[in-house]
Every structure is written in structure tokens, then in C-alpha cells.
Amino acid sequence: QPWLPFR
């Protein structure tokens, strides 16, 4: 995934 809403 290129972006996640958490790290």
C-alpha cells in the first residue's frame, strides 16, 4: 500500500 492511515 502506498499510504496507510497509521504508522
UniProtKB/Swiss-Prot annotation:
Subcellular location: Secreted
Residue numbers bearing the Arginine amide modification: 7
Family in the record: Belongs to the frog skin active peptide (FSAP) family. Peroniin subfamily.
Modified residues (Pyrrolidone carboxylic acid): 1
Cystine connections: none
Protein name: Peroniin-1.5
Domain of life: Eukaryota
GO biological process: defense response
Gene Ontology CC annotations of this record: extracellular region
Tissue: Expressed by the skin dorsal glands.
Keyword vocabulary terms for this entry: Amidation, Amphibian defense peptide, Pyrrolidone carboxylic acid, Secreted
Taxonomic path: Eukaryota, Metazoa, Chordata, Craniata, Vertebrata
